[in-house]
Amino acid sequence: MDGMIAMLPAPLQKLSSHIDFQGQKVAERTYQVILTIAGIIGFLVGFWTQQLSYAMFTVLGASAFTALIILPPWPFLFRKNPIVWHTPAEPQESGDKKKETKKTK
């Protein structure tokens, strides 16, 4: 992903493309709700007009709308809870290495 971001123009490289775990949960739930409602509405529109194309266009339009909402990492939706990483621990010698150093002396 970093390689793809490096190919973008300089102003776009400054934009963050990461979302947190809570943001992923919100994005997934939003995606499910919108597409489920769109499927029901698309079915009803297609049934009422007896046109399968109207049902398909309704669902495709809702899919495009969902992509517009979900794909950008909006800071007010998907980046409210930043991840705090632990600092890396110092490497410690294992018990086997300590025994080997004692034997060589």
Swiss-Prot record:
Tagged with keyword Cell inner membrane: no
Stretches in topological domain Lumenal: 54-56
Transmembrane segments: 33-53, 57-77
Its membrane topology: Multi-pass membrane protein
Any Pfam family: SPC12
An example Gene Ontology CC term for this record: signal peptidase complex
Subunit relationships: Component of the signal peptidase complex (SPC) composed of a catalytic subunit sec-11 and three accessory subunits spcs-1, spcs-2 and spcs-3. The complex induces a local thinning of the ER membrane which is used to measure the length of the signal peptide (SP) h-region of protein substrates. This ensures the selectivity of the complex towards h-regions shorter than 18-20 amino acids.
PANTHER family: MICROSOMAL SIGNAL PEPTIDASE 12 KDA SUBUNIT, SIGNAL PEPTIDASE COMPLEX SUBUNIT 1
Family of this protein: Belongs to the SPCS1 family.
Protein's job: Component of the signal peptidase complex (SPC) which catalyzes the cleavage of N-terminal signal sequences from nascent proteins as they are translocated into the lumen of the endoplasmic reticulum. Dispensable for SPC enzymatic activity.
Name of the protein: Signal peptidase complex subunit 1
